[in-house]
Amino acid sequence: MEKIIEESKQGESLVLENKPENTKKLFIESYGCAMNFSDSEVVASILSDGGYNTTSVLEEADLVLVNTCSIRDKAEQTIRKRLEKYNAVKRTNPKMKVGVLGCMAERLKSQFLEEEKIVDLVVGPDAYKDLPNLLAEVEEGRDAINVILSKEETYGDISPVRLMSNGITALVSITRGCDNMCTFCVVPFTRGRERSREPQSIMAEIQDLWSKGFKEITLLGQNVDSYLWYGGGLKKDFVNASEMQKATAVDFDQLLEMVAVGFPKMRIRFSTSNPQDMHESILHVMAKYPNICKHIHLPVQSGSNRILKEMNRLHSREEYMALIDKIRAIVPDASISQDMIAGFPTETEQDHQDTMSLMEYVKYNFGYMYSYSERPGTLAGRKMKDDVEEETKARRLQEIVDLQQKHAWFRSEEFVGKTVEVLVEKVSKKSKDEFSGRNSQSITVVFPKENYKIGDFVNVKITSCTSGTLKGEAVGLSSMN
């Protein structure tokens, strides 16, 4: 659940710069979290070397891949509908091959290949380098599957091919997997245990992005704050590392500082943070460097200590609130966003009110809110009865959404009259005469184009707002240019 999901990007097909020598066409769609979109860029890079150019036209594809999400039942149902669409096209183009990547691949491998026979290959999140071999199997008329989870794989040696439509912002994966066995979450089972990527490969990827004109990167992982490089391997095995490995290990605040110092004119974001792993040292690094964005995505899921324990969250309500207090003290201009689940098994009205009161305490800038969706294979799915009525879940979720909307207005109004630095990302959807970008706090800002261009850092004085957007007038370029 702890993933930033951009609803506007769901199902976006990845179209990249083509190589003239490539003769085959790849159609790849992504669903779910930012990690899936990042992984699709890795996959496109691997297949580009194997003779594939990307296309946005499904009907002309030789190979169709969908990068899948298992976090909610709704996500899986959406992907199943897409698979039906792919197979309808395949009936008129029988040479087309269809494959499933990502979390559903690991979870439903046998069902897809053997029982329903709706795909030709199934590839888990740690097996993308094996795609050329798996495609060779498919060409020989055999089903192909690799969902083995790795202790080492981070794709640190793959240079992802980037989306050509923006060229300003990019995702940089730094960790894979998760060790926090939350009872509602499939991630540890579909993406494996935590392991971190070698720092120099991260720095090299960012250097490559900088040389190509990118202005902002997001350091990405299921749990970025627990980043720990000690020479490779699972984080849980760090206790067995040598004294030299322990002495030279790099943790997240050290990595964050390395990137901030190495690329002072590049904006740096990171996601996602887990409350128990966000230490004060990280906050001090954020406060020290102006190019580190002042936004923290800090999922809590519930404000009830009893429900947090049922979820196997490794923090209490009080510990979370104390962390919020630290953030406000050390990084006072930071925005904070949340993930929240309504209607977790056994949740009472008092548990729900505890969530509402926590939200009142924090007053989040924005959030990602869901009603509980039982996921097969999770501890909650195996051991807990989904006993909260759907009608009750829906009501509680709406109350959470309504309260978040109120707080978003409150936080947006705090910016009115202030001048904020905005990285121009695109032309506004609502007006071709306006630019749209985000400020350091990850809030969308819209302002008249004038003579500015995409990729500029512009100081904008905020004159009005909605709950999700700030509006203003440009007052000049910022010192980040």
Swiss-Prot record:
One matching Pfam family: TRAM
Oligomeric form and interacting partners: Monomer.
Localization of this protein: Cytoplasm
Enzyme class, broadest EC rank: transferase
UniProt name for this protein: tRNA-2-methylthio-N(6)-dimethylallyladenosine synthase
Binding annotation for [4Fe-4S] cluster 2: C178, C182, C185
Superkingdom, natural source: Bacteria
Record-listed E.C. numbers: 2.8.4.3
Gene Ontology CC annotation, any one: cytosol
Domain TRAM: 413-476
Recorded catalytic activity of this chain's protein: N(6)-dimethylallyladenosine(37) in tRNA + (sulfur carrier)-SH + AH2 + 2 S-adenosyl-L-methionine = 2-methylsulfanyl-N(6)-dimethylallyladenosine(37) in tRNA + (sulfur carrier)-H + 5'-deoxyadenosine + L-methionine + A + S-adenosyl-L-homocysteine + 2 H(+)
Record domain MTTase N-terminal: where: 24-140
Domain spans labelled Radical SAM core: 164-411
Assigned protein family: Belongs to the methylthiotransferase family. MiaB subfamily.
HAMAP family associated with the record: tRNA_metthiotr_MiaB
UniProt remark on cofactor binding: Binds 2 [4Fe-4S] clusters. One cluster is coordinated with 3 cysteines and an exchangeable S-adenosyl-L-methionine.
Taxonomy of the source species: Bacteria, Pseudomonadati, Bacteroidota, Flavobacteriia, Flavobacteriales
One Gene Ontology term of the molecular function aspect: metal ion binding
Originating species: Flavobacterium johnsoniae (strain ATCC 17061 / DSM 2064 / JCM 8514 / BCRC 14874 / CCUG 350202 / NBRC 14942 / NCIMB 11054 / UW101)
Residues annotated as binding [4Fe-4S] cluster 1: C33, C69, C103
Function recorded in the entry: Catalyzes the methylthiolation of N6-(dimethylallyl)adenosine (i(6)A), leading to the formation of 2-methylthio-N6-(dimethylallyl)adenosine (ms(2)i(6)A) at position 37 in tRNAs that read codons beginning with uridine.
Annotated keywords: 4Fe-4S, Cytoplasm, Iron, Iron-sulfur, Metal-binding, S-adenosyl-L-methionine, Transferase, tRNA processing
Cofactor field: [4Fe-4S] cluster
